[in-house]
Amino acid sequence: MTAPASPTAVPRATLRLQLHRAFTFDHARALLDDIAALGISHLYVSPITTAQPGSMHGYDVIDPTRVNPELGGEEALGRLVAALHARGMGLIVDIVPNHMAVGGAHNAWWLDVLENGPASAWAHAFDIQWQPPQPALHGKVLAPFLGEPYDAALQGRHLTLHYDPGAARLAIAYHDHRFPIALADYAGILRGAGTSGERDTDAALDAVADRFAALQSTRALHARRAHADAARTALRDFAATDAGRARIDRAVAALNAAPEQLHALMARQSWRLAHWRCANDEINWRRFFDIGSLAGLSVERADVFEATHALIFRLYRQGWIDGVRIDHVDGLVDPAGYCRALRQRLAAEDAHRPADRRLGRPWIVVEKILAADEPMRTGWDVDGTSGYDFMNQVGALLHDAAGEATLTQAWLDWTGRPAAEAHFRATALAARRRILHEHFAAELDAAAWALHAVAQQQRDAHDVTWHAIRRALAELVVHLSVYRTYADAHGRDAQDTDIVRRAIHDALPHLRRVDQPLLVRLGAWLGGEPAGHDRLRQLALRRGQQLSSPVAAKAVEDTACYRYGRLLSRNEVGADPGAFALDAAAFHQAMAARARLWPHAMLATATHDHKRGEDVRARLAVLSERPAHWLAAALPWRAAHAHWVRTLPEGPAPTPDAQWMLYQTLVGAWPPGLDWRDANGVRAFAERIAQWQHKALREAKLRTDWLAPDLDYEQACHDFVFTLLTGEAASAFLPSLAACVRTIAPAGAVNGLAQMLLRVTVPGVPDLYQGADLWDTSLVDPDNRRPVDFAVRHRSLRALQANPEHSLAPLLAHWTDGRIKQAMLARALSVRAAMPEVFAAGRYLPLPLSGSGGAHALAFAREHAGRWVVAIVPLHAAALLGHAAVPAFPAGAWRDTTVCLPAPLASMPLHSVFDGQMLCGARLALGQTLGALPVALLHS
């Protein structure tokens, strides 16, 4: 079935592609026939604006006004769009409003800020604190881009003055970084080399120097910029002559030969160089998380909003793009206000789109991490999230709550942790506290100073000290159960009021009694009372709310999830590892709410940011059903491998925690078709595991981390991996590992197929991450961004198209190649294409099950205007599979289990999409419905 020729505002299904210089718009265009054949309506791509040269992801934007030339530029984008439209498809793009890449030598806006300081035309575009408490940074930007202490860089001649003839700019060079010199210093630098004896050259240089010297007396900003442009043009002309360039080179060389003079020059600039480790303590501008090469943007300012979105608005107006996914919306000052403004601007452009591309309401989803029991806000005027909440829901559904206690105790016993650390919350709180104080100390200081300024306005808070505020604020942030609150000048809503109330309650015991009353004050200052037009209150609110989000992200996703290893399939972006499982009733309730509130939100099970591929998680979920099987394998492995655990002064390498998580990762990520005797295949797998482990160890921040890596520990852990997989231990370990995987892999595949079918059939817009149409055993980036073998996928898809009506059951004989997953996905998406209204606007009806296997399946119907779809998937079915070598249930496994259909379906024939059966009756026997294949999709 083909996609409709006319565009629709809401995609039927999306496919995410990661674009970079080795995979461009033209590469994507070459895949469109296969993407369309798979049943995808919209291509969904990583950011397309100009990023740092060589960027592999596009989130490090340096110019939001231009299509990335490394992707082929606007011309290649136009070819892709034309090819999409010819197939009745559309384009969704990822946008990055929160930040831009800085450092290096390519961001013109940032370089202008460094050159001109607060007087820069772009100074207000970045969230810079120009008057921080540190006097050394007044009117300056901290530039923490050095890989060594400042004095070592200066004395080692790694900091040198450099003239760029193309830009007519003098700048300090440090490797690939450029730090522009203020124009007011040009005259002194140019005259610093003395005279040459060549009258004309000396006169020309003096004339150029005079132009720059005159800038100091020009006060009007517009006039100053015009004079600066003229002076730079004069310098460019002067440098174009051999004599002129020689004079400039001489002046530059003179300064480079005098470190003290060079230091004095740098001290006068609007930037202050520092070692990159200084950023966490002293940075005076907002970063993306704790990444010093990504600077926060002030898109809450109307002119910055327009400047950073001009390209997106134009592409939407042209009909080239049909919607957006907003990256890191929680980083913004006012996420709700931003989303509403974006909706209004795109809607205004819709009337100017080509007549055949008008959508009325563009599709907008946000990357928003929702905490447990945190609903998505309904007042943002978006279509929903980008799908991490669904990934969490479906992932938890696949887990069997019965295994939680056994796995929890096993984790404690293995690691020697106390019972107090049994729950993930303890690990998360410890990580939050460390991340806040070690990685966001500067941001915590800034928020505390902003709140202190508010306190000084109030007579009854006259004696509240900055240090007391800092202590109380830190505990409030640590105990906040969500990423952030969304108070504005009018105060906070009931949802946030409850969140802050709980955070205050939880924080109280961690403060001295004398500081405890401050928590209530902070609650009032941070949105509990309307800030109105009070700028100090508004600043304090902004600093506080923009602090908690990156702390939560780095502490939970990027620290605690690498420390707490009970069952790694629950350690995922958007998930709470402490919430082990979700029962069928709760899942149905969540899907009914999704149908009611968010019918057009994105549904994801794999992304460019996931920790583990969707089928790794699906396989590991089987361990919740078979914890004894896991321990029967892991405990002997630990004993057998004790000889290769190295003893270092700080303790064992790897630690018990790391060893447990390594074994789970090996079991989960072992490629389905890999033979343990395939030396090359196993070595390639070992390289991937070692890469994962290196990142996991540093993210955990226990024995090593990114700030101060312990290379001896890392090397010992690296050696341990290769000893197990390719070294002395391999001959015994590999067959044992393969046997362990073999016993749970069929059940894992059933979970994977169930997860896929749920994604395609529940309310929302299913997204397919690149390559995940076959088994996805990827790990955290960069592993999940490896090149995809699209040729293999092309061949299997064409073979499927050659037999469109055949049962897919024969594919189970070779299930490890993943063709069964791709075929089921394509068939399911074809039903979405044939019955779009059922999925876009249809009711969600849970269907009851009865019989001995009723607890091991989930079924529901979607209905619209008398058209019906029924989906049936198994749950926790390892016991039903028994010792089956394929993901198919043995005869008699389901015994008397049936699904009860709604009355309108009782006499209506239903076509089984995957095996071609025609079924009819008030009850469907799962022994028949799931007799040939492990999941079923039926339609009227």
Q: Predicted segment positions?
A:
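Conserved short loop/turn motifs at secondary-structure junctions
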Residues: 98, 326-332, 813-814
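Carbohydrate-interacting/catalytic domains
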Residues: 1-53, 65, 70, 78, ...
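Surface-exposed, active-site-proximal loop segments in enzymatic domains
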Residues: 55-68, 106, 110
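Hydrophobic or amphipathic alpha-helical targeting/insertion segments
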Residues: 80-128
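Hydrophobic "anchor" residues on beta-strands that sit immediately upstream
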Residues: 90, 323, 363
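Activation on extended, non-transmembrane soluble regions of large proteins
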Residues: 33, 45, 89, 121-125, ...
